[in-house]
Design a protein with these regions (language model features):
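Intrinsically disordered, low-complexity segments enriched in polar/charged residues with Gly/Pro
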Residues: 2-3, 28-29, 39-41, 79, ...
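Short, solvent-exposed coil/turn segments
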Residues: 9, 17, 124-126, 193, ...
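Extracytoplasmic low-complexity, Pro/Thr/Ser/Ala/Gly-rich segments
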Residues: 25-59, 68, 257-271
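Generic marker of residues within folded, mature protein domains
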Residues: 14, 41, 120-121, 203
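Secretory targeting and sorting signals
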Residues: 1-24
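Compositionally biased, intrinsically disordered/low-complexity regions enriched for serine, proline
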Residues: 18, 23, 27, 32-35, ...
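Active-site region of chymotrypsin-like
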Residues: 139-149, 172-271
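Serine endopeptidase catalytic core focused on the charge-relay Asp
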Residues: 37, 43-53, 57-190, 215-216
Length: 271
């Protein structure tokens, strides 16, 4: 929630694997009754965000993603992950539907700062945090995205004009989920592929930060990061998930597999 506000100008491949080792997926709770899933709210030191995707490792530990800036400490306008302050790895994160807090086990912001990252696009749009759930809650998790179903895979390419889908869960909507499903178009990628600019109805608002983005085939491609006022008012910046996960693995982060949804992907509602 901290970062997804109006900030001027900025204000993150087909055939890719599901990012991680070839491990058997855990047994998931039924989607209809699972209280923990993509789209639930997370709370980090008072900052509310929306969870994106579910992940697991070779030992069947279960994780859920949020934006790295959800643990930021420098306020809403601090968007450069190589400079902005962050709570440390190990910070507890409340995940709606879970009985116990999870733990922040990876932050792209913390990792970039400790490694001296200097690439401008990476610093601006590498915006993912990984929360390890408490084992007591593993049996409460389903990886399906509400309303849309999926994800069905992972892609690093969404061309200008391609359909995009998301599901946000800002507390500003006061529990009204009618506007949570989002459908729109990609306006193209920039920053060396790190950022997808998208326009959806309705746009992402504070509290939707971190929410999942998938393409018209249900493939995961991004994490909601920013609300832009230029060049297109109410457009959103979406960090590229494939690059975020590759960066995590190559910089000592957990080696995770993106969990596929158990529910069929319904596809876009509009042509």
């Amino acid at each position: 929630m901290r970062r997804l506000i109006a900030v001027c100008a900025v204000v993150a491949c087909a055939g890719l694997a599901a990012a991680g080792p070839a491990a058997a997926a855990p047994t998931w709770a039924p989607a209809a009754t699972a209280p923990v899933h993509p789209g639930v709210q997370t709370l980090t030191n008072g900052g509310q965000c929306t969870a994106n995707f579910v992940f697991y490792d070779a030992s069947n530990n279960v994780y859920i993603g949020q934006a790295a800036h959800c643990a930021g400490t420098d306020g809403n306008t601090a968007t450069n992950g190589c400079e902005a302050g962050s709570l440390p790895v190990g910070t507890p994160v409340t995940v709606d539907g879970a009985s116990r807090p999870g733990s922040l086990v990876y932050s792209s912001w913390v990792t970039m700062q400790s490694g001296g990252e200097a690439d401008a696009g990476t610093c601006q749009y590498n915006d993912i945090g990984i929360v390890k759930l408490d084992p007591a809650d593993y049996g409460k998790v389903n990886p399906s995205i509400p309303f849309w179903g999926g994800p069905t895979g992972l892609t690093d390419t969404v061309a200008q004009g391609d359909k995009v889908l998301s599901y946000g869960n800002s507390s500003l909507r006061q529990g009204v989920t009618l506007l949570s499903p989002k459908e729109g178009l990609s306006l193209g990628q920039d920053a060396g592929g790190w950022n997808h600019t998208v326009y959806t109805v309705s746009p992402g608002i504070p509290g939707d930060s971190g929410s999942a983005f998938i393409d018209r085939q249900g493939r995961a491609f991004g994490v909601l990061s920013t609300l832009q006022i230029a060049p297109l008012p109410a457009g959103n910046g979406v960090g590229d998930l494939s690059r975020e996960l590759a960066y995590m693995r190559s910089h000592g982060g957990p080696n995770l597999t993106l969990a596929m949804g158990t529910e069929p992907f319904r596809g876009p509602l509009l042509p």
